[in-house]
Each structure stands twice: as structure tokens, then as C-alpha cells.
């Protein structure tokens, strides 16, 4: 016959099977198998008077104990056995016998059908109803035919063991949920601190990060940004507060398609606004104090210049115009500083300068020359001291700002190092887990090999003993054979001499002995081959013992990795302590800023009080006349006139030559 090679490219297609008929036949066969098994078990129960279905949960319990001992250790397996034993005792003592047998049998059969591939469907439900009906109608009442005392512990185990497994499942579910909750809390805290550290960075770095994010999103094809951000890039937004409020809105719009992350991102945006609002308010307050101080200085200069201008225009203008001018000068910087917190605009200064120049440049210069020393003479020493204190406070404020910027840079560097350390920690943990898995597998293989070695050594000893026993038997058989041959020769000689009757029996005996000798030699050869195979296996196992040194190297590497992880954890804890110290220093700097701002407000209040006192003193002083020798062009006018003073309810006469108190 010729051998034909099959062509793989021209294989025949298998016949198509109808899935509907296959499913029907498979399901019917499966449920028929269930019914046959159930009927056989019931028949065995009735014949042997024992509930054999109770042995299945006991077998499951033994398997679970073996698995727990294999994977979780001896302590957990002992604990599991104790818990199962206590639950069995409770079910045995507190549940009535009939209900105990009914619940155990129904649970076993329902669980047996539940573990099929079909799951919950109409045939399984019908089988459950049949099992429950048979148990409740027939077997619930007939307990006299069974060995109740023998079956009762197994029935209690059929109920107690599932209760224990359900308890462990519930405990694992609760621990899983608690772990998830703890992870979410830690994630929220990390996001909060990360956002705080990002907001602590300088605005230039924030803008750079923002531009990089926008470039990445534009490259990915995300939707367009909000118009407010485009205006900010064009230079429309002057403040930092709009940036802080625009960031969460952008994140919310970009990630609005993901329904699960919507609420989380929105809450994070709100938290970011709440964090940024106090920082922006502090910055605005500092700017307001600086602008207020500058406005006060400008106000003092403008008061002196307006007094000179008003003296020049006293001959031509009425008192109302002077009052309006003074009111505008005095009120405009205050209103600007109170509402906007900014320095008065330079346009008002230019308008006032134009007014002064329109009335005569020479007269204005002379008036300014006369006015400057008078203002310098009228300023008290307290104002000079207050201005010096304000300068010192400004210097302290700038120093605190520099310290704050340095602290923020340190925080950003520490956060970057922390990220690197966390990534290294994750890598080291993964390597540690891999090494532990390798070590566990190596230990398991070592245990298995030890067991195999012990078994093979036992077999080798048994084979050696059998070999020695067979060799002894062979020697004895050889001796017997020699003796029998000698006796046979003698008998043959004797028989040949005397009679020839027993020759046939002796020949048959000799043949049987020869056959037995051949069998023994064959058995001896087989045993020798087995001994050789066992010796080869022993040599292989010895080689494996020599390879166990690699496991020791893995153990040393694992210990080194554990030491490294411990060192990294210690360094991470030290860095967290440094962060806490930096946060405390930042809080102290903010407190010093607040104290400086309070001192500036107190100094401003003292300046206002001193100005009021100066105004009262000027109102009480007598009118002083100046000689016309200084400037022949300017008319003689008093330094202070009653036209410039507003009508007050006091009874003092400012035109009197010498001040006289009122007579009551």
C-alpha cells in the first residue's frame, strides 16, 4: 500500500450543525442527566437508609480547607474550620430535626442545579419546584426509615457551611467598599493639595502650563475654548481672579461628555475658586494699601498747590467756585481709592496743570515758590515719622513677598521630587511583587521536588529490598535446582537400573522448574531496568538541589529591594514634614502681612486725625498780613481768609485781631 500525504490546503469543510437543535438536545440531555442523578441518589437513600446528598457539602468543605491551607496558611485554615464547626453546632442545637433535614436537602439540590452552565431559566426553575415539592410532601414526613443520629450532623453542616461562606463573602464585600471609599478620600485630598500647589506657582508658570494644555487640546481636536480666555491672551483681562474662575469652567466644558466625571470636576472647580478667592483678596488688599498711600501723598501735594491757586484767583472768582474746587480736590482721590483701589489718573493732574498755566506762568511760579516752604513748615514731625514707617512697612511687604515666592518655588520643587519618588515607589513595589511571586513559585517547586525526592527514595528502597529478596530467591532456586538435578540424576540412574516407571513425572517436573526459572530471570531483568531508571531520577534530583542556590540569590535581592523601599518611605515621610514646615512658614508670612496692613491702616487713621487737628488750628489762628516787597505784581492778600472757610455752627469770630473766648 502506498502512503498518501494529506493536502492541508484542500481540507474538507465540516458540516454545519444547526445550533437550535443542538441547544435543545444538549439542554434536554443535561436535565435528563440531573433527573437520573437525583433519582439514583433518592434510590440509594431509600435502600441504604442514609442521605448521600449531604456528603457533597462535606466534600466542598474539605476542598476549601485544603485550598485555604495551601494559599493562606495554617492559621487561616484552622480559623475557618473553627468557625464552620461552631456554625454547625449552632444549627445542630437550635434547628428542629424535620426542618433541618428539609432545609439541608433542598439547599443541596438547588445548589447542584444552580452550578450548571444554564443559570436561571425555565427548566432549572421547574426542577427546583419539583425538588422542593418532593422534599416537602414526601420526605419531610418520612424520617423513620433513616438513621437520624448519623445524618443529623451532615445536615447541620449543609446549612452551617453555606452560612460561613456567605459571611466571608459579605465581609470581603464590605472591606472592598471601605477600601474604595478610603481611596476616594485620599484621591480627593491629593487633588486638593495638588491644586493648591499649582495655584501657589507664579502666574507666569501658570500661564505657560495653561498655554501648553490648550495646545495639546487643540492638537487632539477638542472643541474651542471660551471667548474669555481668548480675550485674556489678547490682553483684555487685567486681573488674576478671572483666570482662577476661568480654569474650572474650561475643565468642566472640556470634560462634559464624560458623565461619570462631571460632578467630580465641577466640585473640584468650586474648591479651586474657594482656594483662589482668599489669595486674590489678599493681593487686592495689598494693592489697595499701596495705592491708598500714594493717593495720600498726592492729596497732600495737591492741597498745597490748590491753596496757592485759590489765593491767586481770590480777586476774580467767588467763594462757591473755591468751595467746589476744594471739594473736588479733596474728594476725588478718596472716592477713587475707595471704589477701585487704584491710583488717581494722570488726566486730572494734567487738567489742573493746564488751568494753572492758563492764568499766567510767572504768577504760578512765584506762588509755587512761596507755597513750598510754607507747606514744609506746616507739616509736623509726626507726618514725617509716619511716612518713614510706611516706607519700612513697604520694604517689609516686599521682603515677605519675596519669601512667599521662594516658599512657593520650594513647594513646587518638592512636589516634583515627590512625584518622582512616588513613581519610583510604584516601580519598586511592582518589582517586589514580581520577586515575591517568583520566590513563592520557587518555594512551591522546591516543596514539590522534595516530596518527589522522598517518594522516589522510598521507591528506590523498596525496589532495592525487592531486588535483594528476588536475588535471595534466585540463589535458593538455583541451589534447589542443583539439588533437584542431582537427585533427579540419581533417581534416573536408580530408575534406569531398577525401573522405568517415574521418568515421565520427573520430566514434567523438570520442565515446570525450568519455566519458573525463566520467569524469575525475566522478572529480575525488569527489576534491574526499574532500578536504573530510579537511579537516573535520583541524579536529576541531585542536580536540582544544586540549582537551589539561585533561590538564595533571589532572596538576597528581595531583601535588598525591601531595604530600598523602606529607605524611600523614610525619605518620603521626611519630605512631607518639610512640606508641613513650609506651609506653616507660609501661614506665618501671611499673618505678618495682615499685621503690616493693620499697622498701615492705623497710621492712615492717625494721619487723618492730625490733618483734622491742623485744620482746627488753622481755623483758630489770627490773620497774618504779608508785605508787598516780595512781589510787586501780586496784590497783598492775607495768608488765610474767611472766604475759604465754610460756615460752621461754632460761635468763633475768625476776623478778630486777637482771639477772645465767648462770654457766657
UniProtKB/Swiss-Prot annotation:
Glycans are attached at residues 324, 340, 452, 655. It is a multi-pass membrane protein. Residues 320-348 have a biased composition (Polar residues). Its main location: endoplasmic reticulum. It is found in: Rough endoplasmic reticulum membrane; Nucleus membrane. InterPro entries: Macoilin. The modification Phosphoserine is found at residues 305, 332, 631, 634. The chain crosses the membrane at residues 28-48, 75-95, 120-140, 154-174. One of its GO terms (cellular component) is neuron projection. GO terms for biological process: brain development; chemotaxis; neuronal signal transduction. GO terms for molecular function: microtubule binding. Residues 252-265 have a biased composition (Basic and acidic residues). Keywords: Endoplasmic reticulum, Glycoprotein, Membrane, Nucleus, Phosphoprotein, Transmembrane, Transmembrane helix. Residues 252-274, 320-375, 630-664 are annotated as: Disordered. It holds the Pfam family Macoilin. Belongs to the macoilin family. Plays a role in the regulation of neuronal activity. This is Macoilin. It comes from Rattus norvegicus.
Amino acid at each position: 500500500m502506498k502512503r498518501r500525504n494529506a493536502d492541508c490546503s484542500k481540507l474538507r469543510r465540516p458540516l454545519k450543525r444547526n445550533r437550535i437543535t443542538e441547544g435543545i438536545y444538549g439542554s434536554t440531555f443535561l436535565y435528563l442527566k440531573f433527573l437520573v442523578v437525583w433519582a439514583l441518589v433518592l434510590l440509594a437513600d431509600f435502600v441504604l437508609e442514609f442521605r448521600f446528598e449531604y456528603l457533597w457539602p462535606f466534600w466542598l468543605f474539605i476542598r476549601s480547607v485544603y485550598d485555604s491551607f495551601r494559599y493562606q496558611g495554617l492559621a487561616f485554615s484552622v480559623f475557618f474550620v473553627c468557625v464552620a464547626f461552631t456554625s454547625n453546632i449552632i444549627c445542630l442545637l437550635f434547628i428542629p430535626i424535620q426542618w433541618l433535614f428539609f432545609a439541608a436537602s433542598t439547599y443541596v439540590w438547588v445548589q447542584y442545579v444552580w452550578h450548571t452552565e444554564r443559570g436561571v431559566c425555565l427548566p432549572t426553575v421547574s426542577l427546583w419546584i419539583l425538588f422542593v415539592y418532593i422534599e416537602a410532601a414526601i420526605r419531610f414526613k418520612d424520617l423513620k426509615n433513616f438513621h437520624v443520629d448519623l445524618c443529623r450532623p451532615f445536615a447541620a453542616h449543609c446549612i452551617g457551611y453555606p452560612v460561613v461562606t456567605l459571611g466571608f463573602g459579605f465581609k470581603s464585600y464590605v472591606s472592598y467598599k471601605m477600601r474604595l471609599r478610603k481611596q476616594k478620600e485620599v484621591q480627593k485630598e491629593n487633588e486638593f493639595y495638588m491644586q493648591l500647589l499649582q495655584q501657589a506657582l507664579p502666574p507666569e508658570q501658570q500661564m505657560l502650563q495653561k498655554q501648553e494644555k490648550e495646545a495639546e487640546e487643540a492638537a487632539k481636536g477638542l472643541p474651542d475654548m471660551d471667548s474669555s480666555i481668548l480675550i485674556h491672551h489678547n490682553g483684555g483681562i487685567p486681573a488674576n481672579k478671572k483666570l482662577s474662575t476661568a480654569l474650572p469652567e474650561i475643565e468642566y466644558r472640556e470634560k462634559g461628555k464624560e458623565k461619570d466625571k462631571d460632578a467630580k470636576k465641577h466640585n473640584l472647580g468650586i474648591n479651586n475658586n474657594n482656594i483662589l478667592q482668599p489669595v486674590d483678596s489678599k493681593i487686592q488688599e495689598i494693592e489697595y494699601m499701596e495705592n491708598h498711600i500714594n493717593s495720600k501723598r498726592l492729596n497732600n501735594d495737591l492741597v498745597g498747590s490748590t491753596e496757592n491757586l485759590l489765593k491767586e484767583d481770590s480777586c476774580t472768582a467767588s467763594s462757591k467756585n473755591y468751595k467746589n474746587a476744594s471739594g473736588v480736590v479733596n474728594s476725588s482721590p478718596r472716592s477713587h481709592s475707595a471704589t477701585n483701589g487704584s491710583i488717581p489718573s494722570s488726566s486730572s493732574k494734567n487738567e489742573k496743570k493746564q488751568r494753572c498755566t492758563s492764568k499766567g506762568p510767572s504768577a504760578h511760579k512765584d506762588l509755587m515758590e512761596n507755597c513750598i516752604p510754607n507747606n514744609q513748615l506746616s507739616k509736623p514731625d509726626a507726618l514725617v515719622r509716619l511716612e518713614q514707617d510706611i516706607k519700612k512697612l513697604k520694604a517689609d511687604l516686599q521682603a515677605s513677598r519675596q519669601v512667599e515666592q521662594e516658599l512657593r518655588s520650594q513647594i513646587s520643587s518638592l512636589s516634583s521630587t515627590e512625584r518622582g519618588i512616588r513613581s519610583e515607589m510604584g516601580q519598586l513595589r511592582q518589582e517586589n511583587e514580581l520577586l515575591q511571586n517568583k520566590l513563592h513559585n520557587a518555594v512551591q517547586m522546591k516543596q514539590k521536588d522534595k516530596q518527589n525526592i522522598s517518594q522516589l527514595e522510598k521507591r528506590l528502597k523498596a525496589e532495592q529490598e525487592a531486588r535483594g529478596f528476588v536475588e535471595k530467591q534466585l540463589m535458593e532456586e538455583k541451589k534447589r535446582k542443583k539439588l533437584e538435578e542431582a537427585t533427579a540424576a540419581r533417581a534416573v540412574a536408580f530408575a534406569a537400573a531398577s525401573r522405568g516407571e517415574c521418568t515421565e513425572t520427573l520430566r514434567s517436573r523438570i520442565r515446570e522448574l525450568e519455566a519458573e526459572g525463566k520467569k524469575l530471570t525475566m522478572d529480575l531483568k525488569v527489576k534491574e531496568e526499574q532500578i536504573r531508571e530510579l537511579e537516573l531520577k535520583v541524579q536529576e534530583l541531585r542536580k536540582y538541589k544544586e540549582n537551589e542556590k539561585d533561590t538564595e540569590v533571589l532572596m538576597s535581592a528581595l531583601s535588598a529591594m525591601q531595604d530600598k523601599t523602606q529607605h524611600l518611605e523614610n525619605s518620603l515621610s521626611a519630605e512631607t514634614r518639610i512640606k508641613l514646615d513650609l506651609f506653616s512658614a507660609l501661614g506665618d508670612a501671611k499673618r505678618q502681612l495682615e499685621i503690616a496692613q493693620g499697622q498701615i491702616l492705623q497710621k492712615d487713621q492717625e494721619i487723618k486725625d492730625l490733618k483734622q487737628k491742623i485744620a482746627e488750628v488753622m481755623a483758630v489762628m489770627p490773620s497774618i498780613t504779608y508785605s508787598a516787597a516780595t512781589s510787586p505784581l501780586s496784590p497783598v492778600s492775607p495768608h488765610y481768609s474767611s472766604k475759604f472757610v465754610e460756615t460752621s455752627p461754632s460761635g468763633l469770630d475768625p476776623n478778630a485781631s486777637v482771639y477772645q473766648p465767648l462770654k457766657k
